[in-house]
Amino acid sequence: MNHQYIPSPIYSDQNSGVHNVNKSLHNLNINNGNNNYNYSNNNYNNNINNNNNINNNINNNNNNNNNNNNNNINQYHQNHYDQYSDNNCNNSNSNNINNNNNINNNINNNNINNNNNNINSNNNNNNNNNNNNNNNLLKIPQLNISPNGVGGGNGISNGNGVNKIFSKLDLSKVPNSYQLAHNSSMPNSPTSSNISPSTPTSMALNLSSLKSILDSPPAAPAHSASSSHNNDHRTLNINGNHHNNNNNINNNINNNVNNNINNGNGNGNGNGNNNNNNNIGVNGSGSSNSSSPSIGFSIPLLQLKQIGINNQTSPSQQSQQQQQQQQQQQQSQHNGIPLINTTEIHQRSNPSSATNSPRALYYGNESSVENSPFTTPLSSPRGPISPRATINSSMSNLQSNIRVEEQWKKIEYYVNDLSHFIYESIRNKDYSNLSELKEKIDEVVNTSKEIEIIHSIAKSLPPQTRARKKRSTKAEKLQKDLIGIKRSYVTTPKSKGTYCIFCGTMETPEWRKGPGGHKTLCNACGLHYAKNIKKENQNNGGSPNPQQNNVTTTTTTTTSTSTNSPNSNGNNFSPESAMSVSKLISD
């Protein structure tokens, strides 16, 4: 069978004999359900050929045809993915990729050297007597410890359930400014001092082992001797069987100084004989087939270190703590990691540090805000208005009001002085000065008595305003109106014999000219008479009324006749003249 060389980011350096991984490798996703090896990188510029690099060379010279299992190793390319395809890739008797999804790779002598960041992986199999196994080597990227650290995941492990890839990771060379990832489903894991190749290396640390890690000096960040970029951030995301097990664990390996150890959403299964779980990561043993992800949170260790027995922090430490907290919040928002604000925990755990005032010590920790006794509130709740306040509001004496206001200001001063004296006595814990206390209380009492005296004097004073005028009744109003009307009339005594020739009234404001001459008609009748004469003159075109002429003639005759008679009255008219005048007035 011809060898098929697959372009891959995994390569082997022939000169050094050390298997290195492309610096741009970011994500290694092993999907156990589909047996897909997904390699995600940014730049694949390595031309892998037979002469220069040996890229996961699967030698099939001594393959057993009975072990053909038709497994497809597909590497696909979408945006940042390249697709690899190799059908019927069967190794010799040692490495079997079978339908049970078991990848049993015994990887021994895994030394992680922080000086050159090279991982020497020698794949030695006891069941393999063929030299072709040297061509099928699992290439692991150089582990530059990152803020997210090395966490548990689903991937490749040996058949005994122990992952030996990261088993010799020395945590003493990892800077101690990382985040602790806590998962309720993870047991108490060993510290950096007792990690051995036979121990499952669960990187979740318990709180009892923090002190030994925090007290150790931070080591310098690892730098690769073969890397040309010191700040090259490389990330290895190892995801387990996402479709079957729902346990996704992201192991972010970067080159930052602040290194975080993160546990993701569950623990992988390190049993090599399990059909659904093939582990690459820290958790090399155990089984987690639960479909519900566990809830994880991270606590900054630098803040936990500052929480001592006495919980006392200086202002400089508080400022550094706030800066570190802001940086960690920004980093957690970038990585999607929830953080716990330990500043609030510190304040809650030390309530006595909130205030050290004597009032708080005397009354208890009720409030950390102290109000000065000299500050008067703008508005204070008032009770019901007393009758005395009602009398004071109705009092119109301006001078007494001014005196009352002065007394109230005086009593306000005395009360504030008394409260200040009590406050200082409690703060200084001096409770023996009773004479001064009594003196200040007497000042307040005497001022209140003066205010009462002023109120009593103001009440006894007569009002300075006039009494309100009494309202007259309706009958009185009518009588006053009648009196006023009568006074406006001009009365004429009946002895004179003057009266209106039309209505017969003897009282009128003014006598008017009528057909009998001057002052023969009352005011009302004279107005009607003059108005009707004007209308008749207008209707007749300016010619005099014949009736008027007749009336005038008759009046003249009667007057001349009456003048001759001794018993005649000047105001006596004939019936005809009276009818004519009444007709004019009535019209």
From Swiss-Prot:
GO molecular function: DNA-binding transcription factor activity; transcription cis-regulatory region binding; zinc ion binding
Gene3D superfamilies xref list: Erythroid Transcription Factor GATA-1, subunit A
Chain intervals annotated as zinc finger (GATA-type): 500-525
Pfam families xrefs: GATA
Disordered: annotated span: 53-141, 179-294, 312-392, 536-587
Keyword vocabulary terms for this entry: Metal-binding, Zinc, Zinc-finger
Classification via SUPFAM superfamilies: Glucocorticoid receptor-like (DNA-binding domain)
GO cellular component: cytoplasm; nucleus
GO biological process: adenylate cyclase-activating G protein-coupled cAMP receptor signaling pathway; aggregation involved in sorocarp development; chemotaxis to folate; DNA-templated transcription; regulation of aggregation involved in sorocarp development; regulation of transcription by RNA polymerase II; sorocarp stalk cell differentiation
Polar residues biased stretches: 75-86, 340-358, 365-379, 577-587
InterPro entries hit by this protein: GATA_TF, Znf_GATA, Znf_NHR/GATA
Biased composition range(s): Low complexity: 53-74, 87-136, 183-202, 237-264, 272-292, 316-333, 538-575
Domain of life the protein comes from: Eukaryota
PROSITE patterns per record: GATA_ZN_FINGER_2
Matches recorded under PANTHER family: GATA TRANSCRIPTION FACTOR (PTHR45658), GATA ZINC FINGER DOMAIN-CONTAINING PROTEIN 10-RELATED (PTHR45658:SF128)
UniProt name for this protein: GATA zinc finger domain-containing protein 3
Taxon lineage: Eukaryota, Amoebozoa, Evosea, Eumycetozoa, Dictyostelia
